């Protein structure tokens, strides 16, 4: 089956494969997903801290097992003192409709902390059928 090039007048345009490779490799450097976090939890203690950056009330209703609640607005150096300087963090919020995880990631990066965002947030976690704590 032969494919014709995309019409340049259309909204969806073809991308340069090398540019696409660079783009998606960069995304994977900063993002993970619910499945990968779940697999890490199943295999033993992950080598990162899972931060639920939602409100305490939302956290209390249910959260990823082992996650620590630290709302994104409270991510400051003194609240990270309990974690080693080299600790890596995976942050999540309510879901794709929420930018709390992005805000948390910015704050952590500004504090020179390693961070990834868990795509899907708690909504994605529940959609996958994973247990809450």
Write out the residue ranges for each language-model feature.
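Short acidic-hydrophobic, aromatic-tinged amphipathic segments that line or gate anion-handling sites
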Residues: 70-71
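Catalytic cysteine-centered active loop of the rhodanese-like fold, especially the PTP/DSP P-loop
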Residues: 80-126
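Small-side-chain structural scaffolding
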Residues: 17, 34, 53, 67, ...
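Alpha-helical scaffolding within the catalytic cores
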Residues: 74-79
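Flexible, polar/low-complexity N-terminal or interdomain linker segments that lie immediately upstream
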Residues: 1-61
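Short loop/helix-cap segments at secondary-structure boundaries that form the rim of catalytic
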Residues: 59-65, 125
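Short active-site oxyanion
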Residues: 44-50, 65-66, 88, 114
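Active-site neighborhoods of enzymes that stabilize oxyanions during catalysis
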Residues: 129-133
């Amino acid at each position: 089956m032969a494919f014709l090039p995309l019409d340049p007048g259309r909204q969806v345009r073809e991308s340069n494969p090398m540019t696409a490779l660079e783009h998606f490799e960069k995304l994977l450097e900063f993002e993970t997903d619910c499945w990968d976090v779940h697999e890490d939890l199943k295999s033993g203690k992950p080598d990162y801290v899972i931060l639920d950056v939602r409100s305490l009330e939302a956290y209390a209703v249910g959260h990823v097992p082992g996650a620590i609640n630290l709302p994104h607005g409270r991510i400051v150096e003194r609240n990270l003192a309990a974690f080693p300087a080299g600790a890596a963090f995976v942050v999540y919020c309510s879901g794709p409709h929420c930018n709390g995880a992005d805000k948390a990631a910015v704050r952590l990066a500004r504090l020179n902390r390693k961070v990834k965002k868990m795509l899907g947030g708690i909504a994605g976690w529940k959609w996958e059928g994973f247990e809450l704590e």
